[in-house]
Structure formats: structure tokens, C-alpha cells
A protein has these predicted regions:
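Acidic catalytic/metal-coordinating carboxylates
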Residues: 36-39, 62-65
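Active-site residues of response regulator receiver
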Residues: 55, 83
Length: 201
């Protein structure tokens, strides 16, 4: 019986390449391709995949948000992240979201296929270089600080953030100030840059 795989990737060339690699394997069936997490959630219901293979950075809904939503809904699907981001912070957040596979896009195709089989069988498949780093530096940010800092890093003003999150501007400034202090940053832009570099946003 084939392992049913749904691929989620916003770059068409990478999406096609991953699908082609998996289709070569006799025991895999690519049952769907999505450009973001929102599309993927709709396809999960329709195509009933065993494994979702997703990128992290995508519009509409990131791979980490998709994994967290799959976990929240208790969908019977295993999630593998395939990304260019070799950051322990991302891996830690992925594990917290119930992800059981985390590989880098430059991994050999045999590693990718083996990871799908291992995860489908109930195991884990984590990039060995990242696995050793994952608990070395804990993420100091709260969920709300992360949310506010991500929006600020994307250029939103305190007023914009307050409006979108239904908070007061003073509360938004407090969250940003806390995040800056925790990261040792001089301003919100630097704080967002540091947090992104460490994989915390």
C-alpha cells in the first residue's frame, strides 16, 4: 500500500522537483500539492494524506502554523518540514507543533525518501546537525512578543499592530520593549533581525 504524501511549497520549481523525486519511489503516491498552509488544510480533508511535507516560509499560513493547526485539530497526519533554514529555533518550534521530520532542502533524495518512510512508520527524522543544537539556546520570547515583533519586523507601526491584534498602543510598545530587552537589541528592527536569525520568528 502506497504512502500518501501532500507537498506544501510556495515555489513552483521546488514543488515540482519534490513531487518528481517522490513519484520515482514505488511506495509513494503524491496525492496533492499546495502553495501555502491554508490550501494544504483544504487538501488534507479531500486527499487524506498520510504525510504532509511542507516548507516553513509561505504566504497565508506558514509551515509551522500549518503543523500547529494539524496538531490542534488532531488530524491523523504526520508532518515533515523541508526547508533551507538550518536554525535550531525553527526546529524547536516545529517539534513543539508536533512535527516529526525536519530536513534541509539540500539533503540527498534518498534521505528525503527514507525520512518519509520513517515518519510514516511512527519514527522521527531530524537533520542530525540541527538535532544537537536544538536545546542549546532557549527561545526567550512569549507567543505574543513573537507575534508583535514579527509584525514590527515586517514594517507595521505600533498603531497598525494594535489595530490588528485589538490591543492598545501602549501594550504593543510594552511587548516590543520586553522583546528588545530580552534580545539585547537597540530597536525593534534589530530585535526582529536577531530573532529571525535565531529562528524564533
Amino acid at each position: 500500500m502506497s504512502i500518501r504524501v501532500l507537498i506544501v511549497e510556495d515555489q513552483s520549481m521546488v514543488l515540482g522537483a519534490l513531487a518528481a523525486l517522490l513519484e520515482i519511489e514505488r511506495d509513494f503516491e503524491v496525492v496533492g500539492q499546495a502553495r501555502n498552509g491554508e490550501e494544504a488544510l483544504a487538501l488534507i480533508a479531500a486527499s487524506k494524506p498520510d504525510v504532509v511535507m511542507t516548507d516553513i516560509e509561505m504566504p497565508a499560513m506558514t509551515g509551522l502554523e500549518l503543523a500547529a493547526e494539524i496538531q490542534r485539530r488532531r488530524l491523523p497526519v504526520r508532518v515533515i518540514i523541508v526547508t533551507t533554514f538550518a536554525r535550531a529555533g525553527y526546529l524547536r518550534r516545529a517539534l513543539d507543533a508536533g512535527v516529526t521530520g525536519y530536513l534541509l532542502k539540500d539533503s540527498p533524495s534518498a534521505t528525503l525518501a527514507g525520512a518519509v518512510r520513517r515518519v510514516h512508520a511512527g519514527g522521527r527524522a531530524i537533520d542530525p546537525e540541527l538535532a544537537g543544537e536544538v536545546w542549546t539556546e532557549p527561545d526567550p520570547l512569549t507567543d505574543r512578543e513573537r507575534q508583535v515583533l514579527r509584525m514590527a519586523g515586517d514594517g507595521a507601526s505600533s498603531a497598525d499592530i494594535a489595530g490588528r491584534l485589538k490591543l492598545s498602543e501602549g501594550t504593543v510598545r510594552n511587548y516590543l520593549s520586553e522583546a528588545m530587552n530580552k534580545l539585547g537589541a537597540a530597536n525593534r528592527t534589530e530585535a526582529a533581525r536577531i530573532a529571525r536569525m535565531k529562528g524564533w520568528l
